[in-house]
Amino acid sequence: MAKQYDVLFRLLLIGDSGVGKTCLLCRFTDNEFHSSHISTIGVDFKMKTIEVDGIKVRIQIWDTAGQERYQTITKQYYRRAQGIFLVYDISSERSYQHIMKWVSDVDEYAPEGVQKILIGNKADEEQKRQVGREQGQQLAKEYGMDFYETSACTNLNIKESFTRLTELVLQAHRKELEGLRMRASNELALAELEEEEGKPEGPANSSKTCWC
């Protein structure tokens, strides 16, 4: 039986509540968009397999609650992430200003060398824009991150941003990747993570489908 994937790792979506993290996740994994979602409680996740440079990559994508009361629960997931999206809403200056706080959390709790991309979401809401594209580009430059403006509503840059973060993680794990290519019969889990081990490590749960 052919392998379903070659490598397996985790991506994390973080940012203020209401910036559209769940919408980004659903658009990428299921190609669905719903204008309203119940706020994530704790942590939720979805899986998707994509191919990058001939490598089948199984991605476990975690959607974290942005509310302060869930921060103790969600921060435990930073430690095993290989890639992180830091998301703000272009129609919310407040969510943009809070990116500095989220970066600080990543620096404190995520592993060294974790790959990061800055996302300015809800790009379809141009008439409500409070954060200029140039502001996002400048902030990303300051932190050494790639930057995308996205829209889950119109599907703008959804595939592109997720594919790019996947590429960055693969590049960061080049040695393991070369080992995979030399031993094509062996499966390599970059996150040392089996799917059944993805169960939340605490009382986290979600109003949406998840292991809890």
Curated annotation (Swiss-Prot):
Under the heading CDD domains, the entry gives: Rab15
PTM Cysteine methyl ester: list the residues.
C212
- Lipidation annotated as S-geranylgeranyl cysteine: which positions? C210, C212
How does the record classify its membrane topology? Answer: Lipid-anchor
In terms of InterPro entries, this protein maps to: P-loop_NTPase, Rab15, Small_GTP-bd, Small_GTPase, Small_GTPase_Rab
Write out the GO biological process terms. Answer: exocytosis; positive regulation of regulated secretory pathway; protein transport; Rab protein signal transduction; receptor-mediated endocytosis
Annotated Gene Ontology cellular components are:
cilium; cytoplasm; endosome membrane; extracellular exosome; perinuclear region of cytoplasm; plasma membrane
Q: Which residues bind Mg(2+)?
A: T22, T40, D63
Ordered alphabetically, the record's keywords are: Cell membrane, GTP-binding, Hydrolase, Lipoprotein, Magnesium, Membrane, Metal-binding, Methylation, Nucleotide-binding, Prenylation, Protein transport, Transport
- The UniProt transmembrane annotation reads none
Q: Which PROSITE patterns match?
A: RAB
The function of this protein is: The small GTPases Rab are key regulators of intracellular membrane trafficking, from the formation of transport vesicles to their fusion with membranes. Rabs cycle between an inactive GDP-bound form and an active GTP-bound form that is able to recruit to membranes different sets of downstream effectors directly responsible for vesicle formation, movement, tethering and fusion. RAB15 may act in concert with RAB3A in regulating aspects of synaptic vesicle membrane flow within the nerve terminal.
Q: What is this protein called?
A: Ras-related protein Rab-15
Q: Which organism is it from?
A: Homo sapiens (Human)
> What gene is this protein translated from?
RAB15
